[in-house]
Amino acid sequence: MIPQSNPTAQRRSGDAQNTNNVAPNSVATTTDTALTASTQSGSSSNNANKKLEYIGVYKIGPEIGKGSFATVYKCIDTTNNKAVAIKSVYRSKLKSKKLLENLEIEIQILKSMKHPHIVGLLDYKQTTSYFHLVMDYCSMGDLSYFIRRRNNLVKSHPVISSLLHCYPSPEGSHGLNEVLVLHFLRQLSSALQFLRDKSLVHRDIKPQNLLLCPPVHSKQEFIDGEFVGMWELPILKIADFGFARFLPSTSMAETLCGSPLYMAPEILRYEKYNAKADLWSVGAVLYEMTVGKPPFKAGNHIELLKNIEKANDKIKFPSAAQVPEPLKQLIRSLLKYNPTERISFNEFFNDSLITCDLDDNDQPLETSQMDENLFISEYISPIAPAERSQFFKEQKKNDSVVRSPSPTTATTATPRQDNVVQQMTKITSPVPDDFALSIARNSSEFNLKKDDMNLEKDYVVVEKRAVEVNALADELAHAGAGADAIPNSRKNSDVDQTNRLASSQQQTETASYRRSSSSGSQKRPSFSERRISLSLSPTNALTKAIGLASNRLFGLTTNSSHSNVSAIAEDDDSSTSNNDASSFSTVIPSTNNHVLLQKLNLATIGEPGTEFDLGSVSNLDEQILDKLELIANIANAVNLYADVKFSQIIPSPPSSDGIEDDTEMLPPKIIHMISQEGIGLYIKTLSLLGRAMDIAGQWWFEKYDAVHGERPSFETTVRINQIVQWIREKYNISLERLEFLKSKSDFTAEETIEDNEPNGTTRVQQAIFAAALGIARETALKELLRNSTDIECSYVTSIYMLLAILEDLEESDRQEVKKIIEKINSRLKNFMGK
């Protein structure tokens, strides 16, 4: 699989479409070092232009897509000055025969694909470090980006503005206009029929792999290019054939691949499947086009399969989507659980919705102001770095709108104690008050290891990583290395009890934020009532969440896990209002953390290196295990903070009469702000979890895939697999919550997007930094006031949160954060030594 980022880089130009001059054995004229410099650049666009780097005759432009194995660049063909997309695949990442085979098959398939609705391979070059696939450039991005961001793009993209003016979505619907749906369906079916004639199954059809190009300039050009649909509308093309296979109608496959949300149930069941799996994916994509979201969602593929089975082939459509009955029937015939009951390809291709004539209005869209070389995401202009610090200053003044002073400041301690507390908090974090602002001011100069300055791009990367994360976890589990395969002191009846508790929590919170239950529910609190819980500062909310989850952070023995959780919950209920209790119950992670750290490694935690150094461990497998445990705990700390944001947005069950007063909803600006903060935190969590999976994957390859690999110890294998399974579950749950927050953010973005909205990475860095300091300060207060509850856990969590941002900082800021970590660690050691 060669993941591509959303929106992936490609744009079909009229001249390039007819060239298709594939040169499989040609070699790039530049050195690998030149491209590597461009790849590692914090701003690939500027560096590429300044250094005038080339791949053959192609001038390297800005990075517009990124995955685990490849980076996509917008480039210029200097022979005709046309834009192309170059997908540069890292040779070093393709360490197994299967990955190399996927790439070779993708290249072979693309070389034979010459169809107007399939992304064409124009050229192919390779160097000692990269495979370069030169492909059509689709400047309008992908279908997923178009569906989710059209309310923002309509203000700045001339073609989309004209398109949605002519074909608006139904009022109250998040889906597309019926005409657009049928137009894209016609083009998708044309490409699928071409693949079917060649006995090809794509196996990864999803909105992210359906790319869009601007409309052609005339009806005659449309006819000459053999396009289908309406000539005045955008052109859809299928991309990313990394999973595709030549699969005759009598053949079956059994490889788990593709995006789970659009994956056929027979693939989710690990059963053999045929080309009909693509038809399920088409039905899922068609549903998303009409409704605005996938037909089924879940935190992992197991839950997804359960949801599909539970639906029992009953596909429901929101009334606001106004989906016509023939379209509903087609979608339902595609989304049949049993592939034998699913509509056949011939029936699909001959459906009246596909064969009927679409009425062209012969009125072209407004394209005069469109730059065809400009990528779609570039139409949403980023904030200028100089304006970021101003935003944060203004945000400080406006914080009172959402947050009230910390309840800790209302202590009843004596004046003398107050003075001591103030001194201690200053000692605990002796950092200049403007340190956080220095992070914002210098954000554009951070030495980031990847260009994650755009949260939208990062979201797509982590979304695509979900397939790899689940595949690796499945491989380890099925190899007999799983905890279920051997006896373990931690796997006993108490663990089962803890798992049941975690499962119960997950079911409760899932039912809550999906509004799946309305019986016996209370009316949603008004905004003034909800402000009570929202006014808690993130620090206080996070501290409370940490207290509730302390047994999981420390990996307490399973004998006491259940009782501790119950005791904490009872104590919390007795000290807070019902409203607060219900609010924070959703913060508790539903996964079971008993596989995590059994030790704190305090001797090394105070001197973290840029690569999360763990000190000297003689055994390489133990080093891998310790590194995985540390990164998993760092990710878990950030995830706790993200869950706080999620709990503030999560919807309450509807009232018994099914009526909600619009005045009782949170203002869109606040929803958008909290959602954006949560999105950034979840993306940071997912990037850390993905990093841990990369380490585990490398270990797995060296120990099992390599011919002369030395087998690890039995116990180490089990422990690493336990962490991998925990990471997989945490990754899937975090990704689902991220998608939920994105839906909230996208829905409110039209009313709240402002030019001075801060950079996404800056916002995340500041939020984590401020929360970590806040936890440390409040923990010092609790320690001074002889309140020893969760002191150890809170200090360690603040350290983990600071470690999460350490690598992304430039050297001067990194040294300041290290000093803070050392101070907190010193206080932790003193407390533990008492």
From Swiss-Prot:
Gene3D superfamilies with a match to the protein in the record: Phosphorylase Kinase, domain 1, Transferase(Phosphotransferase) domain 1
InterPro entries listed in its UniProt record: Atg1-like, ATG1-like_MIT2, Atg1-like_tMIT, Kinase-like_dom_sf, Prot_kinase_dom, Protein_kinase_ATP_BS, Ser/Thr_kinase_AS
Annotated catalytic residues: 204
GO molecular function: ATP binding; protein serine kinase activity; protein serine/threonine kinase activity
Short name of one Pfam family: Pkinase
Subunit structure: Homodimer. Forms a ternary complex with ATG13 and ATG17.
Protein name: Serine/threonine-protein kinase ATG1
UniProt organism field: Candida albicans (strain SC5314 / ATCC MYA-2876) (Yeast)
The encoding gene: ATG1
